Amino acid sequence: MKDFFRMRTAQQPATRHWRHTVAPGGLPLAGHALLMARKPLQFLASLPAHGDLVELRLGPRPVYLPCHPELVQQVLVNARVYDTGGPVKEKAKPILGNGLITSDWADHRRQRRLVQPAFHTARIAKYAEVMERECEAESTAWTARRPIDVSHEMLALTARVTARALFSTDMAPHAVAEIQHCLPIVVEGAYRQAIDPTGLLAKLPLAANRRFDDALARLNQLIDRMIDDYKASDDGDRGDVLSALFAAQDDETGGTMSDQEIHDQVMTLLLAGIETTASALTWAWFLLGRNPGAEAALHAEVDEVLGGRAPRYADVPRLAYTQRVFSEALRLFPPAWLFTRTTTETTELGGRRLPPASDVLISPYVLHRDPALFPRPDSFDPDRWLPERAKEVTRGSYLPFGGGSRKCIGDVFGMTEATLALAAIAGRWRMRPIPGTKIRPRPQMSLTAGPLRMIPEPR
C-alpha cells in the first residue's frame, strides 16, 4: 500500500521567479475574513490563479497561503521553522491537551518516537481484526431498500473501529456508544471556538457551550477510566493502541509516557481518527453513486477478489481499485482541508520575507483542485491513481494525510480501514442515490458532507 503514495519529484529549475500577491476582495478592517467565513472553499480554490504565494488578511493580521507544491513542501519539511502555532492551536490545547497535533516541534519529535510503534505493520494487522468484524457487522445490519443516512452509518462504523482498536476488542458497548454520542458534539464545539476570533463565544451561557463542556468532560472521564482499568489489570499487551502506548520507550532517552501524556494521545487519536475517515467514506459513496462506471468497476474487483465472502486484511493488497476509489475521494474532499503553521524565526518563502510568528495556511483542497496539478480536477477518476499515472503526480501536490514529520501517524490505519469498509459494503450492496438529494461540502474541523441519504439495494 505504501507504494501507492510514492510519487515522482517534479523537476524544478535551479532558480525560480515566484509570484506573490495579495488576494483580491479584501475589505477595510475585516480583510478577507468574510470571504473565508462565507465561502472558504471557493475563495481558497481561486487563489492559485493569482500567485504562488498569496497574502490574505484575517482582520488586521496577514496570513500566507502557498499555492505551489514546492512552497508547500518547503513549509512541511522544515517543522522547526514552520511549527504548529497561532490562535487555532491555542484554542485546541484545552481540548486535545499536549498531543501529536498540538505539541511544539521539539516535543513532537519525542512524542512521535513514542507513539509510532503503536502503528507499526504488525500492530496494524492486529487492528485489522477489529476492522474486519466491524465492517462485516455494518454491511449485514442494513435492511434492503430502506433509506439510510450514510454519514451517520460511517461515523458509527469508524467510531467502533477506532474505539476498539484503542481500548481492545472487548470494550463495553456502552463505552463505544458514549464515544459515538460525545465525539460529534466535541468536534462541532471545537470548530466553533477555533473560528471565533474574539474568544468570547465559548464564555457565553449558551446551550451549545453546555453540551460541549458536558461531552468533553464525559470523553475525558472515559479515557481516564480506560487508563485506570488497564493499569489495574494484568493483561500485558492486549494488542490495542493503549497497550502500545504504555509499553513505549524512547530509543534515544529511555523515557516513557506519563498517564497524562497517554490521555492526551488517546484524545488526539479519537478526535483525529474517527470523523476524518467517516467523512471520506461518505464522500466515496456519494461519488460512486454519481459514477456508475466506477461503481461497476468496484463491484467487479470485489467479486473477483472475495468471491462473495467478507474481506480480510490479507486481501487489501489485491483490492487495488478499491484503494484508488478511496484515494480519489480523499483528493476531491480531503478531510484535513486546511491547517496552519507559524514561523519560529525570520525566514523566506517564495521570495517573501516572513517575520517570526507569521501564520501560514496549508490547504490540501487548494492543491487537489488545481488544474495545473490535476487534469480535470473536479472529475472523479480513480484510475488517475494507477501506478503509471500516479508517478506523474508532482511531489507535494497530494496531501490527504499532510506531510513532513507531522504527517498523519494513522495514514495506513485509515487506508486499511476504508479499504475493508468499501469492500465489505460493496460486496453486498449497491448504494443508490435518492433523486433530488443535494449535498455540499461543510468545511469545519474536517470536510464533512452532512446527512447523505441513500438506498442500499441487494446485489
Curated annotation (Swiss-Prot):
Its EC number is 1.14.99.62. GO terms for molecular function: heme binding; iron ion binding; monooxygenase activity; oxidoreductase activity, acting on paired donors, with incorporation or reduction of molecular oxygen. Heme binds at residue 408. InterPro entries: Cyt_P450, Cyt_P450_CS, Cyt_P450_E_grp-IV, Cyt_P450_sf, Cytochrome_P450_Monoox. Keywords: Heme, Iron, Metal-binding, Monooxygenase, Oxidoreductase. It catalyses: cyclooctat-9-ene-5,7-diol + AH2 + O2 = cyclooctatin + A + H2O. The keyword Iron applies. It is an enzyme of class 1 (oxidoreductase). CDD domains: CYP170A1-like. PROSITE patterns: CYTOCHROME_P450. Its cofactor is heme. It comes from the Bacteria. Involved in the biosynthesis of cyclooctatin, a potent inhibitor of lysophospholipase. Belongs to the cytochrome P450 family. This is Cyclooctatin synthase. It comes from Streptomyces melanosporofaciens. The gene is cotB4.
